[in-house]
Amino acid sequence: MANALLVAAYKPPFLSSNACLSRLKKHFGMSKAGYLGTLDPFAKGVLVVGFGSYTRLFPHLQKVPKAYRATLWLGAKSASLDIEHIESIEIIPEYNQSDIEKILFSLKGTFDYTPPAFSAKHINGQRAYKLAREGKVFTLQQIQMSIYNITLLSYHHPFVHFEVSVSEGAYVRSIGEIIAKKLGVNGVLSSLERISEGQMSVSATEQIRILNPLEYLPYPQLENMHRFSKQMYDGKKITLKNAQKGKYIVCFEDFFSIIEIFSNGGIQYILNRIEYVDTFKKTR
């Protein structure tokens, strides 16, 4: 068994991300692990998990756009903006599909919004969702999100089924709330599925896919570096003359590193001596 892994797992609905992580730790027999982006308990879909030293790659992985499919239930009200805390259901008249399509199209772009109270945001060191469950009153700071694309898949009143690709920091539950408010009603998400984080994905039938991290790092690979293998393994200073400044991946026989080259040819180790999963040696 490898000491490090990067996997895309398909989280079932009504299971917390932490509970899913615990199952995966047991499945792979590894104790050190973390996930890239939290999925709401009621949601299903892609949960990217790193084991061992691969958790160090999280800040560097290409994880946007994030793609989701969601169903908005018009007329339903919930403090959590999903079906877990339904407070009331109102029967509302049907809308023209073209009006819904116009609203969805108007959301494309970047804007500030207030994230939902039932979220993983921190308030004085505590998770917002814990405070919300206790009935505590608090205000979350506005954050920014970008909607790159949003498409109406179907409208069967009172359910609006749509697909959306977004930036980090976006809550699809809030997108559902915004759509409902523009229609003049309450609304909650009755289903939510994360399709992908960047290019990292897995299907419901596949369940678990082992990923090659080299395919999901946004940096170019620096070639002809084998003569520096021992020096870089030991983390020694080296100078790379005539190299363009920037961040690079350097691959050796038994490990790879992420470095930054400066204009004077000096380098900084961003991440050094990251081991391969045997299957992925020399695949990039």
Curated annotation (Swiss-Prot):
SUPFAM superfamilies, sorted: Pseudouridine synthase
Catalytic residues in the record: D40
Keywords from the named record: Isomerase, tRNA processing
Taxonomic superkingdom: Bacteria
Lineage, top ranks: Bacteria, Pseudomonadati, Campylobacterota, Epsilonproteobacteria, Campylobacterales
InterPro entries from the UniProt entry: PsdUridine_synth_cat_dom_sf, PsdUridine_synth_N, tRNA_psdUridine_synth_TruB
Record has Repeat as a keyword: no
General function of this protein: Responsible for synthesis of pseudouridine from uracil-55 in the psi GC loop of transfer RNAs.
Entry's EC annotation: 5.4.99.25
UniProt GO molecular function: RNA binding; tRNA pseudouridine(55) synthase activity
GO BP annotations listed: mRNA pseudouridine synthesis; tRNA pseudouridine synthesis
Catalytic activity from the UniProt record: uridine(55) in tRNA = pseudouridine(55) in tRNA
Name by which UniProt lists this protein: tRNA pseudouridine synthase B
Membership in a protein family: Belongs to the pseudouridine synthase TruB family. Type 1 subfamily.
